[in-house]
């Protein structure tokens, strides 16, 4: 059988499922010393350290003078890739921009009867660094990662956006990444990968100016570097392996369910694909489909490892129990393959993104629909959200107190200050009474 079959009807059942999922946690502590050494080297030696790591791990003959991609190389890549592919990238970017434009927040103000004005101002960060993974040595360009990270930053109004991505063995970048950058109007692109690229974005080098915020997925070294830089720069999130949970009733198409589970399982041996259904018949049919469909995949070994180790088909007493389990898992991707998707939606509390109905498989959102595919994983959808325009913004409160407000409330404010042992605070407000 391609993956285990479980049941869920009690807290004890949940403990078993939770233990299975928790086993996927990356042992970040194991690489911390290595990442710390990399970060220290970048901080002290800048471009020289960056070039050294790039020669060692990516391109043996890397020329430091090619660290930043020349503008004409970006334009050339856009001309070289098939025109049809460029049109697809452009349309995907337009869809993503259209969705994220709805997330923009304007400044707002309220005025009290005494004339006091209170409000909130939203401003973008001054600069953002985007990390785009290499994708099998640059052979599988992660175009969607660039689009999903760059577009919300642009909609937010970030003035400077820098992109880093590891070079191929010959020192070049995949032309599809450069073409996507051209479509987006990005021209600050650097040939650098892994933890040394993240450190360069945070600390700066002779060539790369430091940024205020870093976003983008990566391996355990990238993730560890981002986590260790919290407080130095803002980061998008600490993401774990990809995951999908599908709630399906007896009317769901088993072939569709299996295909959607495999769309996540092929990502990574640590990826998780879970079907939750009240239908034993569907559960059995999906098992059969998984075995049939996995055979034809180029990444079949990866998918099989994911299905075997971290995936499951869970049979529940009813749909309510399926929703209950889903809310406990808090999946990155949640598909609702049930007859009344909108009726079930109101019961969903925890999910990174929700895919509704048979025509909304997860890849539709991953690539093209418009919502962001940078989503919370490992149960963090209980308290966090997808990458968005707000991720690249800061909010400042505005307080313009009237004389009447301050003088009327000075004694109360001073009393609160003195209760906290802060005499200077009390005197500050009392000085406005004279």
Curated annotation (Swiss-Prot):
Source species, domain of life: Bacteria
Pathway: Amino-acid biosynthesis; L-histidine biosynthesis; L-histidine from 5-phospho-alpha-D-ribose 1-diphosphate: step 9/9
InterPro entries: Ald_DH/histidinol_DH, Histidinol_DH_CS, Histidinol_DH_monofunct, Hstdl_DH
Active-site residues per Swiss-Prot or TrEMBL entry: 332 (proton acceptor), 333 (proton acceptor)
Key words of the record: Amino-acid biosynthesis, Histidine biosynthesis, Metal-binding, NAD, Oxidoreductase, Zinc
Primary role: Catalyzes the sequential NAD-dependent oxidations of L-histidinol to L-histidinaldehyde and then to L-histidine.
Protein's name in the database: Histidinol dehydrogenase
């Amino acid at each position: 059988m391609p993956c285990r079959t479980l049941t869920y009807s009690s807290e004890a059942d949940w403990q078993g499922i939770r233990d299975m999922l928790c086993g996927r946690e990356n042992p970040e502590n194991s690489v911390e010393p290595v990442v710390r050494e990399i970060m220290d080297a970048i901080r002290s030696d800048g471009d020289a350290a960056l070039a050294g790591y790039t020669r060692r791990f990516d391109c043996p003959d890397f020329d430091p003078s090619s660290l930043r991609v020349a503008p004409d190389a970006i334009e050339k890549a856009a001309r070289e890739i098939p025109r049809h592919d460029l049109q697809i990238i452009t349309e995907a970017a337009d869809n993503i921009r259209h969705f994220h434009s709805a997330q923009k927040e304007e400044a707002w103000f309220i005025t009290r009867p005494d004339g006091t004005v209170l409000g909130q101002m939203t401003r973008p960060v001054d600069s953002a660094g985007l990390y785009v993974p290499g994708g099998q040595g640059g052979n599988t360009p992660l175009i969607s990662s660039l689009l999903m990270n760059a577009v919300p930053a642009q909609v937010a109004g970030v003035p400077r956006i820098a992109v880093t991505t590891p070079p191929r063995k010959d020192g070049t970048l995949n032309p599809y990444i450069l073409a996507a950058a051209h479509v987006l109007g990005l021209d600050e692109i650097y040939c650098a990968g892994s933890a040394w690229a993240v450190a360069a974005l945070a600390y700066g080098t002779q060539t790369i100016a430091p940024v205020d915020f870093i976003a983008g997925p990566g391996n355990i070294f990238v993730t560890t570097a981002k986590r260790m830089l919290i407080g130095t720069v803002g980061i998008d999130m600490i993401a774990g392996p990809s995951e999908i949970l599908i709630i399906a009733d007896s009317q769901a198409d088993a072939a569709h369910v299996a295909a959607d589970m495999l769309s996540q399982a092929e990502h990574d041996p640590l990826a998780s694909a879970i079907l939750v259904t009240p239908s034993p018949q569907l559960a059995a049919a999906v098992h059969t489909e998984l075995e049939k469909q996995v055979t034809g995949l180029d990444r079949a070994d990866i998918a099989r490892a994911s299905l075997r180790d971290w995936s499951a088909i869970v049979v529940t007493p009813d749909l309510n129990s399926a929703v209950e389990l889903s809310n406990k898992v808090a999946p990155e991707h949640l598909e609702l393959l049930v007859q009344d998707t909108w009726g079930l939606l109101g019961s969903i509390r925890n999910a990174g993104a929700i895919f509704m109905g048979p025509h909304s498989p997860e890849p539709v959102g991953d690539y093209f629909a418009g919502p962001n595919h940078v989503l919370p994983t490992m149960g963090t959808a209980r308290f966090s959200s997808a990458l968005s325009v707000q991720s690249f913004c800061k909010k400042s409160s505005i307080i313009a107190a009237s004389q009447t407000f301050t003088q009327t409330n000075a004694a109360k404010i001073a009393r609160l200050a003195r209760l906290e042992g802060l005499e200077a605070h009390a005197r500050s407000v009392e000085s406005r009474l004279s």
